[in-house]
Amino acid sequence: MTVRIALDAMGGDNAPRAVIEGMLEVQKKRPEVVFTLVGIESRIRQELEQMGVEEDGFRIWHASEVVEMDEKPAVALRTKKDSSMRVGANLVKENQVDAFVSAGNTGALMATAKFVLKTLRGIDRPAIASVIPAVGGETLMLDLGANVDCSSEHLCQFALMGSIFANAVLGVRAPRVGLLNIGEEDTKGNEQVRDAGEQLKARSATLIPGGSYVGNVEGTDIFKDTVDVVVCDGFVGNVSLKSIEGTAKMLTHYLRGAFTKNWKTKLMYLIARPALRCFRDEMDPRKHNGAILLGLNGVVVKSHGGADSVAYAHAIHVAVDLAEKQVTKRIRDAVAKFRAEGTQPSDPAV
């Protein structure tokens, strides 16, 4: 199956070099993927020439403007209609590509994607979702910052989209969905979370197709083999994600310090090096790069702004997976099914 992926060649701290290198890395493993580099053509060609790369297996699509990393989303949306970000989203809308990847300004990407592609019918707001490494596998977490305030209906919609993603992309046959809360008891949390819990419990068969609602989960459960999808609002999700990233960096720092204290610890490092390399690879944030904007009429993946070629390549692989497994269509079909039955994810529980 040929998959067409558009890349924002201007987005991110290391663009366009990291974008091109990431693309070339994916081409080695997936030669059937066809790429479109979107951005200022002269800058892209100059970079390709410096790298000694010939135009093969990809095309260049000129976009005359660039959204800066510190630019306000509303300003970018209003004034930069020919930005690489806007053009990339339009290519998805016009079905010229199957997915779009950008390491650019997160707020501007969300605003642009929502404006151009619109949300799926029956989904009020898109959510940022990402896969977190966990014991025995992986956990999908959403929302990670798109929506600071969420109603119970929004949380239920996130649960629906998350369960479909877990099944289609992560291969979880019966996704277990939990609401991130300050305790496991049904009485814990704010009103929105409590109401969402009641709806998910009453309608898990329709809101979590083929899966189950396991109730409230705490922060420690994210890494356990007890839940496959963790649902929360964007404020809680973003704080949790940054805490996870900070903890991983702290562990790496402590381990490095412990093994470089003296000649004895350095000798111990030589013995433990194979195991430590496995640990490092598992915890490497570059290999978990690629957040998904779920709920749009098209596939959009957000790469970390500081991504290098390894991290960017992983974000591309995420986009290819989403396109191949038709996650957008699956979510659309699930919501359509609810509407045909006279209900939808935003309806109150009955």
Curated annotation (Swiss-Prot):
Originating species: Magnetococcus marinus (strain ATCC BAA-1437 / JCM 17883 / MC-1)
Catalytic activity: a fatty acyl-[ACP] + phosphate = an acyl phosphate + holo-[ACP]
Enzyme Commission no: 2.3.1.274
One GO BP annotation of this record: fatty acid biosynthetic process
Enzyme class: transferase
Metabolic or biological pathway: Lipid metabolism; phospholipid metabolism
Keywords annotated in UniProt: Cytoplasm, Lipid biosynthesis, Lipid metabolism, Phospholipid biosynthesis, Phospholipid metabolism, Transferase
Name the record gives this protein: Phosphate acyltransferase
Family the entry assigns: Belongs to the PlsX family.
Keyword Ribonucleoprotein: no
GO molecular function, one term: phosphate:acyl-[acyl carrier protein] acyltransferase activity
GO cellular component: cytoplasm
Subunit structure: Homodimer. Probably interacts with PlsY.
Name of a matching Pfam family: FA_synthesis
Subcellular location field: Cytoplasm
Function summary: Catalyzes the reversible formation of acyl-phosphate (acyl-PO(4)) from acyl-[acyl-carrier-protein] (acyl-ACP). This enzyme utilizes acyl-ACP as fatty acyl donor, but not acyl-CoA.
InterPro entries: FA_synthesis, Phospholipid_synth_PlsX-like
